[in-house]
């Protein structure tokens, strides 16, 4: 069962590993990222950041969608993390039903539009969010930590 979906360019870090894991009683984190899934060093760092009480999957989009749709994680409390909205849009297009996405930290550079203190989006991010919004089935919200109030996210 999917208990949380978050966009966070840092993937698994203290806030996600501790606060969200405890609040949502996560038993498995799934990092969905084509590049990270092929990088042994990044996967090792993610393993070290994952709480001992949780399992970790680091998968490319296609494999993540295949496993979720096959019910592989139905008996677990799954928390999905991705760096970019495009990744989650691809997951949705592959047939994974997501009902809400927590828009967390997205890196800010000179080429991006800043949305608040912790979110920076480029044209690709904006297009992905607009397509997700147009589906009408996914609630987008911002909530940095479980103790913060959730706010609707609109592009």
Where are each of the predicted segments found?
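Generic hydrophobic/aromatic pocket-lining and core-packing "Φ" positions
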Residues: 17-18, 88, 129
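Short, hinge-like loop/turn segments at secondary-structure boundaries
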Residues: 47-49, 75, 118-119
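Glycine-rich, aromatic-bearing surface loops/beta-hairpins
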Residues: 85, 93-94, 98-155
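General beta-strand structural signal in soluble alpha/beta enzymes
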Residues: 5, 31, 57-60, 80, ...
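Short coil/turn connectors at secondary-structure junctions
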Residues: 1-2, 24-27, 54, 73-77, ...
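Ordered, amphipathic secondary-structure segments that act as subunit-interaction surfaces
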Residues: 59-104
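Long, hydrophobic N-terminal alpha-helical segment
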Residues: 2-55
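Short gly/pro/ser/thr-enriched loop/turn and capping motifs at secondary-structure boundaries
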Residues: 37-39, 64-65, 108-111
